[in-house]
Amino acid sequence: MSSLNCDPSWPLGDGCSCWRCNRLEQQDRVTADSLQAYRDWCPGVGIDEKHHQLQGIKWCLYHELVEKPNAGVRGGIIADEMGLGKTILMIACIRHNFKARTLIVLPPALLQQWVGVFQRFLGHTPFVYRGSKAKNVTIEKLAQLPVVITTYGMISPRRTDDDKLAYSKLHKIEWSRIIYDEAHHLRNLKTKVHDGACMLKADIRWMVTGTPINNKLKDLYALCKVLGLAKVFTPNKEEIKLLLGIHLLRRTKDQVGINLPPVKTQVVEVDWSSDAERDMAEDIHSMLHFTTINKNNVDEIIAWLNRHPLAALTRARQMCIYPQLLHKAVKKMKRKGIIPQDMNIKDIKTSSKITSVVDHIVGNRQTGKRKLVFSHYRGEIDVLTEKLRNAGMTVQSIDGRTKTRNKKQRILSVVSEPQFHSVCKTWNDLPEGIFGVINSFLAPEVMIVQIQTACEGLNMQHFQEIYFTSPHWNPAVEDQAVARAHRIGQEKSVDVYRFVMNGLGRNSISFEQYCSHVQDIKREVMQILNNK
């Protein structure tokens, strides 16, 4: 990136009038005016002015206004840790550097959240390009709208009857600015949604995600390709660090001086408690071969995992969590010789994992902390719910069966946020933080969540104990899950319990132990985001 000072060979002095200095001074004035406008705006909408947000807005405005952007790219990657206000940065850019046409692309779970943010902070209801609205609106009308919100599914091209790709009305418009929220949804280069994102035309592009790397460096390359940085992206890690130093903004809570209660993590190693359970686990694991993984072969291992029969991996995980999940698959496994013909799943009376999770939750009841349990399967959620309720605890759950509009209500158990606001004349009638206080009284003792359904769009800072029943392949998913509770507003320390089944004998590791090792290597790869 070029220096912000004029050419050292130019005779500097009072009243320097070179074109470059004049441009920079003009840009600085515009940025300063926008920052002051932001400061004046904050009190009226109930935003506390924070230094890290001012610095973030200044960074964003520079990358929108810079006369000659690096590699010709305006915008960048906003990768601040969850809870630092990435959405507010984008709202500030929209308000204080107004553009004629801004498109926001996001997961469906965040649609109403973003609409609410616009209504609250800007007094504007954006057009939602989805469903019948998308079908009926004309391209001319779309081009006249200042803000359009849509989902990743809507930018994905459709295959026509003659096997050609048809792009949406959104692709026929020259957008001033595009914001991709939860941009890690674009990490797969081979998907139609990534192709659709690359084909959208815009002067400014923002990728907003706390996890720009989920599995491997190619995730980051995929985002850079949408930004327009593919030609300057190299495999050299030192050059990648230089590139990120220009185009990526990443801060942690610690770095910006936000002091939250600590997160304490405990790995709970679980032994196989019965011979029947161990015997079946050994048979199922015998079908898998776990290759040693390190930073040099992590990309190849991830590719292998993607090619490996999903059923075998799924069965190994289900066996570790709750063997009864395999009930329908037993006949097929017997037919293929994976397990003996005389093996009966009914002989497995209990699940070592379920027993351990329930015992820990019930045993920790006296802490007074509410428990957030992240699970993988509906059957697992159902049995945990039954056992915890039998122990006298109040339990709610969220899984793929839960409609988006019901998720917040289940977290609160008694009343939803819209219902609460309906008794107030306006949003501003609510004392700051009052809803969080009410949450702390209404939330259930235990909330069980299917991990892939609740890592976006939900704040759960009224829970202080987190349980992962089984490790996820992607550590970023677990980090996001923890961040739902460990965020601004959390007043107690957060205890995290990670349950892992032990190995099955000498030099034999369980599926979950291998999964945990894969996580460790992926975390090492992610350190490039922190310039390490």
Residue ranges and their predicted role:
Residues 28-79:
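Conserved pre-motif I regulatory segment
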Residues 61-66, 85-100, 196, 227:
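Walker A/P-loop NTP-binding motif
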Residues 71-75, 81, 89, 94-98, ...:
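Conserved Helicase C-terminal RecA-like lobe
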Residues 82, 203-216:
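Conserved helicase ATPase motor motifs in RecA-like P-loop NTPase domains
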Residues 100-120, 376-379:
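Conserved Walker A/P-loop ATP-binding site and its immediately adjacent core
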Residues 111-132, 230:
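Conserved helix-turn-beta segment of the N-terminal RecA-like "Helicase ATP-binding" lobe
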Residues 149-150, 154-155, 168-171, 192-202, ...:
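Inter-lobe coupling linker of SF2 helicases/translocases
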Residues 473-482, 486-532:
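A conserved SF2-helicase RecA2
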